[in-house]
């Protein structure tokens, strides 16, 4: 049994401005998002009614410039009842990937469009998927994890993360931890560009 999952796609913008209509349709030109991408929203003033801060939403009904969101994967579209005020921004978040039963987890990290950002990698051992975008707690257990570059064996500290600064690259890493049940990644700062993160393993515990 093999594991191969995508945490981020380089096609998806990591953040961008959007508007929302009472038809529940969110518009953001050439957003690049895909169905089931995970988002959170911020605003300079007030979000459209029906959308909340610090809340995870799943993308659905994608077109080139529009999409809707739901509170659960494949769920009912959120009912947007006004357009809000100010400038609104979506932020792409990493999905929780179930890695239980696999060892020697490997990462492919590919940056595009002169990426200037910081990305950190997260793991959890709890039974149910944690909310990697919420504060750590006894009921939401996760931590940042160290990764090792397979080219030169250099280590990237989990609390520091990986910070490409305008020079795109394709890099491979090993996750420096076994017995991981859940894995994800989070963008902690962003100026430009996109990133694709794939996790894989072809070795499972017997």
Language model segments and positions:
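Short proline/glycine-enriched turn/loop motifs at strand-loop junctions of beta-rich domains
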Residues: 31-34, 102, 113-117
